[in-house]
Protein backbone atom coordinates (compact mmCIF):
# COMPACT_ATOMS: atom_id res chain seq x y z
CA UNK A 1 0.00 0.00 0.00
CA UNK A 2 1.26 3.47 -0.88
CA UNK A 3 0.01 5.72 1.90
CA UNK A 4 -0.84 9.27 0.80
CA UNK A 5 -1.14 11.18 4.07
CA UNK A 6 -2.44 14.70 4.37
CA UNK A 7 -1.06 17.16 6.98
CA UNK A 8 -0.76 15.76 10.53
CA UNK A 9 -2.15 12.43 9.36
CA UNK A 10 0.19 10.39 11.51
CA UNK A 11 -1.92 11.34 14.53
CA UNK A 12 -4.91 9.76 12.86
CA UNK A 13 -3.04 6.53 12.17
CA UNK A 14 -2.73 6.02 15.91
CA UNK A 15 -6.49 6.27 16.42
CA UNK A 16 -7.79 4.44 13.35
CA UNK A 17 -8.85 1.37 15.37
CA UNK A 18 -11.01 3.60 17.54
CA UNK A 19 -12.47 5.30 14.50
CA UNK A 20 -13.37 1.93 13.03
CA UNK A 21 -15.61 1.24 16.00
CA UNK A 22 -17.76 4.18 14.97
CA UNK A 23 -18.23 3.17 11.34
CA UNK A 24 -21.61 2.36 9.91
CA UNK A 25 -21.56 -1.40 10.46
CA UNK A 26 -22.97 -2.05 13.93
CA UNK A 27 -21.60 -4.93 16.07
CA UNK A 28 -24.77 -6.97 15.79
CA UNK A 29 -24.31 -7.16 12.01
CA UNK A 30 -20.91 -8.82 12.38
CA UNK A 31 -20.49 -12.55 12.87
CA UNK A 32 -19.21 -14.04 16.10
CA UNK A 33 -16.64 -16.08 14.19
CA UNK A 34 -15.08 -16.39 10.76
CA UNK A 35 -17.03 -18.63 8.39
CA UNK A 36 -15.10 -20.36 5.61
CA UNK A 37 -16.61 -22.51 2.89
CA UNK A 38 -13.73 -23.08 0.47
CA UNK A 39 -10.64 -21.01 1.36
CA UNK A 40 -7.67 -23.18 2.44
CA UNK A 41 -5.72 -21.45 5.19
CA UNK A 42 -2.69 -23.73 4.81
CA UNK A 43 -2.25 -22.74 1.17
CA UNK A 44 -2.76 -19.06 2.00
CA UNK A 45 -0.08 -19.28 4.66
CA UNK A 46 2.30 -21.15 2.36
CA UNK A 47 2.00 -18.49 -0.34
CA UNK A 48 2.56 -15.68 2.16
CA UNK A 49 5.55 -17.43 3.72
CA UNK A 50 7.23 -17.88 0.34
CA UNK A 51 6.64 -14.28 -0.74
CA UNK A 52 7.77 -12.89 2.64
CA UNK A 53 10.80 -15.17 2.92
CA UNK A 54 14.43 -13.98 3.20
CA UNK A 55 15.17 -15.51 -0.20
CA UNK A 56 12.89 -12.95 -1.90
CA UNK A 57 14.48 -10.07 0.04
CA UNK A 58 11.42 -7.85 0.22
CA UNK A 59 10.39 -8.07 -3.46
CA UNK A 60 11.49 -4.55 -4.39
CA UNK A 61 10.62 -3.80 -8.01
CA UNK A 62 13.55 -4.33 -10.36
CA UNK A 63 15.54 -6.58 -8.01
CA UNK A 64 16.42 -10.26 -7.97
CA UNK A 65 13.80 -10.67 -5.26
CA UNK A 66 11.14 -9.40 -7.65
CA UNK A 67 12.34 -11.82 -10.32
CA UNK A 68 12.13 -14.73 -7.89
CA UNK A 69 8.65 -13.57 -6.88
CA UNK A 70 7.51 -13.66 -10.49
CA UNK A 71 8.97 -17.12 -10.97
CA UNK A 72 6.99 -18.39 -8.00
CA UNK A 73 3.78 -16.63 -9.06
CA UNK A 74 4.11 -17.84 -12.64
CA UNK A 75 4.40 -21.39 -11.34
CA UNK A 76 1.29 -20.86 -9.21
CA UNK A 77 -0.61 -19.33 -12.15
CA UNK A 78 0.21 -22.42 -14.20
CA UNK A 79 -0.72 -24.81 -11.37
CA UNK A 80 -4.10 -23.15 -10.99
CA UNK A 81 -4.75 -23.17 -14.73
CA UNK A 82 -4.73 -19.46 -15.49
CA UNK A 83 -4.23 -18.60 -19.15
CA UNK A 84 -2.04 -15.86 -20.66
CA UNK A 85 -4.06 -13.00 -22.10
CA UNK A 86 -2.10 -12.89 -25.35
CA UNK A 87 -4.61 -14.81 -27.47
CA UNK A 88 -7.77 -13.16 -26.14
CA UNK A 89 -7.55 -9.51 -27.11
CA UNK A 90 -5.09 -8.94 -30.00
CA UNK A 91 -4.71 -5.15 -29.53
CA UNK A 92 -3.39 -5.78 -26.02
CA UNK A 93 -1.23 -8.76 -26.96
CA UNK A 94 1.66 -6.65 -28.26
CA UNK A 95 2.35 -5.42 -24.70
CA UNK A 96 2.45 -8.96 -23.30
CA UNK A 97 4.85 -11.90 -23.20
CA UNK A 98 3.15 -14.92 -21.71
CA UNK A 99 1.85 -13.81 -18.32
CA UNK A 100 4.18 -10.79 -18.27
CA UNK A 101 3.19 -7.20 -18.96
CA UNK A 102 6.33 -5.03 -18.99
CA UNK A 103 6.38 -1.27 -18.53
CA UNK A 104 8.82 1.56 -17.94
CA UNK A 105 8.70 4.25 -15.27
CA UNK A 106 10.94 6.77 -13.52
CA UNK A 107 11.89 5.97 -9.93
CA UNK A 108 13.31 9.15 -8.46
CA UNK A 109 15.80 10.25 -11.11
CA UNK A 110 16.44 6.80 -12.57
CA UNK A 111 14.72 4.93 -15.37
CA UNK A 112 13.16 1.70 -14.16
CA UNK A 113 11.32 -1.27 -15.58
CA UNK A 114 8.52 -3.21 -13.94
CA UNK A 115 6.62 -6.37 -14.81
CA UNK A 116 2.98 -7.10 -14.00
CA UNK A 117 1.67 -10.66 -14.19
CA UNK A 118 -1.69 -11.19 -15.91
CA UNK A 119 -3.68 -14.40 -16.14
CA UNK A 120 -7.32 -14.97 -16.99
CA UNK A 121 -10.14 -17.50 -16.76
CA UNK A 122 -13.02 -17.62 -19.25
CA UNK A 123 -16.66 -17.30 -18.24
CA UNK A 124 -18.88 -20.36 -18.05
CA UNK A 125 -20.64 -19.09 -21.19
CA UNK A 126 -19.16 -16.77 -23.85
CA UNK A 127 -19.43 -13.09 -22.91
CA UNK A 128 -17.64 -9.83 -23.63
CA UNK A 129 -17.91 -8.66 -20.00
CA UNK A 130 -14.84 -8.74 -17.77
CA UNK A 131 -14.12 -8.47 -14.06
CA UNK A 132 -10.61 -7.76 -12.69
CA UNK A 133 -8.85 -8.72 -9.46
CA UNK A 134 -5.57 -6.97 -8.63
CA UNK A 135 -3.03 -7.29 -5.81
CA UNK A 136 0.48 -5.85 -5.90
CA UNK A 137 3.35 -8.24 -5.24
CA UNK A 138 6.19 -5.71 -4.85
CA UNK A 139 7.37 -4.32 -1.52
CA UNK A 140 10.27 -2.27 -0.12
CA UNK A 141 13.17 -4.68 -0.55
CA UNK A 142 16.39 -4.69 1.46
CA UNK A 143 17.29 -1.42 3.16
CA UNK A 144 20.30 -1.49 5.42
CA UNK A 145 20.53 -4.29 7.98
CA UNK A 146 17.77 -6.72 7.13
CA UNK A 147 14.91 -6.79 4.66
CA UNK A 148 11.25 -5.79 4.69
CA UNK A 149 9.16 -8.99 4.42
CA UNK A 150 5.91 -7.30 3.39
CA UNK A 151 3.72 -10.15 4.62
CA UNK A 152 0.59 -8.05 5.05
CA UNK A 153 1.74 -5.48 2.48
CA UNK A 154 0.99 -7.23 0.25
CA UNK A 155 1.75 -10.95 0.25
CA UNK A 156 -1.63 -11.31 1.97
CA UNK A 157 -3.48 -9.83 -1.01
CA UNK A 158 -1.54 -11.91 -3.53
CA UNK A 159 -2.22 -15.11 -1.59
CA UNK A 160 -5.93 -14.31 -1.60
CA UNK A 161 -5.81 -13.58 -5.34
CA UNK A 162 -4.33 -17.03 -5.95
CA UNK A 163 -6.99 -18.65 -3.77
CA UNK A 164 -9.77 -16.88 -5.64
CA UNK A 165 -8.31 -17.89 -8.99
CA UNK A 166 -8.26 -21.52 -7.88
CA UNK A 167 -11.88 -21.28 -6.74
CA UNK A 168 -13.05 -19.72 -10.01
CA UNK A 169 -11.18 -22.36 -11.99
CA UNK A 170 -13.21 -24.99 -10.11
CA UNK A 171 -16.51 -23.08 -10.35
CA UNK A 172 -16.46 -20.74 -13.38
CA UNK A 173 -18.09 -17.33 -13.21
CA UNK A 174 -20.62 -15.82 -15.60
CA UNK A 175 -17.93 -13.22 -16.37
CA UNK A 176 -14.41 -13.42 -17.80
CA UNK A 177 -11.96 -12.82 -14.95
CA UNK A 178 -8.52 -11.22 -15.23
CA UNK A 179 -6.11 -11.77 -12.33
CA UNK A 180 -3.32 -9.20 -11.96
CA UNK A 181 -0.27 -9.38 -9.70
CA UNK A 182 0.98 -5.83 -10.14
CA UNK A 183 4.49 -4.45 -9.80
CA UNK A 184 5.86 -1.07 -8.66
CA UNK A 185 2.88 -0.14 -6.51
CA UNK A 186 5.06 1.02 -3.64
CA UNK A 187 6.99 3.73 -5.52
CA UNK A 188 3.85 5.20 -7.07
CA UNK A 189 1.21 2.79 -8.45
CA UNK A 190 3.25 2.51 -11.65
CA UNK A 191 2.21 -1.03 -12.54
CA UNK A 192 -1.50 -0.34 -12.34
CA UNK A 193 -1.10 2.98 -14.14
CA UNK A 194 0.72 1.29 -17.02
CA UNK A 195 -1.83 -1.51 -17.17
CA UNK A 196 -4.85 0.80 -17.18
CA UNK A 197 -3.22 2.88 -19.92
CA UNK A 198 -2.71 -0.26 -22.03
CA UNK A 199 -6.29 -1.38 -21.37
CA UNK A 200 -7.61 1.99 -22.49
CA UNK A 201 -5.44 2.25 -25.59
CA UNK A 202 -6.40 -1.25 -26.71
CA UNK A 203 -10.14 -0.75 -26.15
CA UNK A 204 -10.20 -3.48 -23.50
CA UNK A 205 -11.23 -1.09 -20.70
CA UNK A 206 -14.74 -0.59 -22.08
CA UNK A 207 -15.50 -4.26 -21.39
CA UNK A 208 -14.61 -4.07 -17.67
CA UNK A 209 -17.57 -3.81 -15.30
CA UNK A 210 -15.66 -4.11 -12.00
CA UNK A 211 -12.11 -4.05 -10.62
CA UNK A 212 -11.46 -5.37 -7.10
CA UNK A 213 -8.21 -4.49 -5.32
CA UNK A 214 -6.73 -6.47 -2.41
CA UNK A 215 -4.04 -4.61 -0.46
CA UNK A 216 -3.19 -5.44 3.17
CA UNK A 217 -5.89 -7.88 4.26
CA UNK A 218 -4.06 -9.85 6.95
CA UNK A 219 -4.17 -7.84 10.20
CA UNK A 220 -7.64 -6.69 11.33
CA UNK A 221 -7.50 -3.75 13.73
CA UNK A 222 -10.70 -4.99 15.36
CA UNK A 223 -12.01 -8.58 15.37
CA UNK A 224 -12.93 -9.52 11.81
CA UNK A 225 -13.03 -5.86 10.67
CA UNK A 226 -12.17 -5.05 7.04
CA UNK A 227 -12.64 -1.82 5.14
CA UNK A 228 -14.36 -2.00 1.75
CA UNK A 229 -13.55 1.27 0.01
CA UNK A 230 -15.67 2.37 -2.93
CA UNK A 231 -19.04 2.50 -1.17
CA UNK A 232 -19.66 6.05 -2.37
CA UNK A 233 -20.04 4.85 -5.94
CA UNK A 234 -22.42 1.87 -5.62
CA UNK A 235 -26.15 2.20 -5.09
CA UNK A 236 -26.44 -1.32 -3.66
CA UNK A 237 -23.36 -1.19 -1.42
CA UNK A 238 -25.31 -1.68 1.81
CA UNK A 239 -27.14 -4.68 0.39
CA UNK A 240 -24.15 -6.61 -0.90
CA UNK A 241 -21.92 -5.72 2.07
CA UNK A 242 -24.60 -7.06 4.44
CA UNK A 243 -24.76 -10.29 2.44
CA UNK A 244 -20.97 -10.63 2.55
CA UNK A 245 -20.93 -10.13 6.32
CA UNK A 246 -23.61 -12.77 6.82
CA UNK A 247 -21.73 -15.27 4.66
CA UNK A 248 -18.21 -14.78 6.02
CA UNK A 249 -18.45 -13.43 9.57
CA UNK A 250 -16.50 -10.32 8.57
CA UNK A 251 -17.33 -6.84 9.85
CA UNK A 252 -17.26 -4.90 6.59
CA UNK A 253 -16.95 -1.16 7.08
CA UNK A 254 -16.79 1.71 4.57
CA UNK A 255 -13.29 3.16 4.71
CA UNK A 256 -14.17 6.76 5.40
CA UNK A 257 -12.93 7.70 8.89
CA UNK A 258 -13.97 11.21 9.79
CA UNK A 259 -11.41 13.87 10.77
CA UNK A 260 -11.33 14.74 14.45
CA UNK A 261 -11.00 18.39 15.36
CA UNK A 262 -9.58 20.97 13.00
CA UNK A 263 -6.00 19.82 12.77
CA UNK A 264 -6.31 16.18 11.76
CA UNK A 265 -6.85 15.36 8.10
CA UNK A 266 -7.86 11.96 6.86
CA UNK A 267 -5.91 9.52 4.70
CA UNK A 268 -6.59 9.87 1.01
CA UNK A 269 -7.66 6.23 0.60
CA UNK A 270 -8.73 6.95 -2.96
CA UNK A 271 -5.10 7.35 -4.02
CA UNK A 272 -3.64 4.85 -1.56
CA UNK A 273 -3.41 1.79 -3.80
CA UNK A 274 -3.89 0.25 -7.24
CA UNK A 275 -7.62 0.99 -7.47
CA UNK A 276 -6.87 4.67 -8.13
CA UNK A 277 -5.87 4.36 -11.83
CA UNK A 278 -9.09 2.42 -12.43
CA UNK A 279 -11.02 5.21 -10.73
CA UNK A 280 -9.32 7.76 -12.99
CA UNK A 281 -10.33 5.68 -16.02
CA UNK A 282 -13.97 5.55 -14.92
CA UNK A 283 -13.90 1.81 -14.21
CA UNK A 284 -16.02 0.77 -11.18
CA UNK A 285 -13.83 -0.46 -8.33
CA UNK A 286 -13.87 -1.82 -4.79
CA UNK A 287 -10.90 -2.08 -2.45
CA UNK A 288 -10.42 -4.42 0.52
CA UNK A 289 -7.82 -3.37 3.10
CA UNK A 290 -7.06 -2.92 6.78
CA UNK A 291 -5.71 0.32 8.31
CA UNK A 292 -1.99 0.88 8.59
CA UNK A 293 -0.74 -0.90 11.72
CA UNK A 294 2.43 -0.74 13.81
CA UNK A 295 4.22 -3.22 11.52
CA UNK A 296 3.30 -1.37 8.30
CA UNK A 297 6.46 -0.72 6.25
CA UNK A 298 8.72 -2.20 8.93
CA UNK A 299 10.88 -5.32 9.17
CA UNK A 300 8.29 -6.75 11.55
CA UNK A 301 5.60 -7.23 8.87
CA UNK A 302 6.17 -10.98 9.00
CA UNK A 303 4.13 -14.02 7.98
CA UNK A 304 3.67 -15.28 11.55
CA UNK A 305 1.72 -12.15 12.52
CA UNK A 306 -1.11 -12.65 10.03
CA UNK A 307 -4.61 -14.01 10.64
CA UNK A 308 -5.06 -16.62 7.90
CA UNK A 309 -8.73 -17.47 8.53
CA UNK A 310 -9.38 -13.73 8.24
CA UNK A 311 -7.52 -13.61 4.91
CA UNK A 312 -9.59 -16.58 3.78
CA UNK A 313 -12.82 -14.79 4.68
CA UNK A 314 -11.75 -11.68 2.76
CA UNK A 315 -10.90 -13.90 -0.23
CA UNK A 316 -14.35 -15.48 -0.11
CA UNK A 317 -16.00 -12.05 0.14
CA UNK A 318 -13.98 -10.72 -2.81
CA UNK A 319 -14.86 -13.79 -4.87
CA UNK A 320 -18.54 -13.15 -4.21
CA UNK A 321 -18.14 -9.53 -5.30
CA UNK A 322 -16.60 -10.65 -8.58
CA UNK A 323 -19.73 -12.72 -9.22
CA UNK A 324 -22.22 -9.92 -8.49
CA UNK A 325 -24.85 -9.37 -11.22
CA UNK A 326 -24.05 -6.27 -13.22
CA UNK A 327 -27.30 -4.58 -12.15
CA UNK A 328 -25.99 -4.53 -8.56
CA UNK A 329 -23.00 -2.44 -9.67
CA UNK A 330 -25.07 0.60 -10.59
CA UNK A 331 -23.63 3.91 -9.42
CA UNK A 332 -25.43 6.17 -7.01
Describe the residue ranges of each PLM region.
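C-terminal motif of bacterial Sec signal peptides marking the signal peptidase cleavage site
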Residues: 20-22
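A non-catalytic alpha/beta surface segment that caps or lines the substrate-entry region
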Residues: 59-121
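Alpha-helical metal-binding/catalytic segments enriched in His/Glu/Asp
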Residues: 119, 133-188, 318
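His/Asp/Glu-rich mid-to-C-terminal helical/loop segments that flank catalytic regions of hydrolases
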Residues: 293-332
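N-terminal capping segment at the start of a domain
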Residues: 27-68, 80-86, 100, 294-301
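Acidic/His- and Gly-rich active-site-bordering loop/insert found
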Residues: 51, 77, 105-144
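Second-shell loop/turn segments in exported
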Residues: 30-38, 54-64, 104-108, 145-154, ...
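Metal-dependent peptidase/peptidase-like ectodomains
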Residues: 182-287
Amino acid sequence: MTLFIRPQMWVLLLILPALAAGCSSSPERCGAEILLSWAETKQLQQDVEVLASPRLQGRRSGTQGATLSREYLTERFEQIGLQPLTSVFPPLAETLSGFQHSFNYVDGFADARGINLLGWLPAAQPTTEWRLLIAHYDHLGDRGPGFYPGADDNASGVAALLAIARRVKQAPSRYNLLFIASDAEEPGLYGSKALVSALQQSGFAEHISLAVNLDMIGRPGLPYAIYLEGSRYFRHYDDFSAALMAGTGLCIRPSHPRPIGRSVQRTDWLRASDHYPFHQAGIPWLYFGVPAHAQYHTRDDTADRLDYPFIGAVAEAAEQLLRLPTKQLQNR
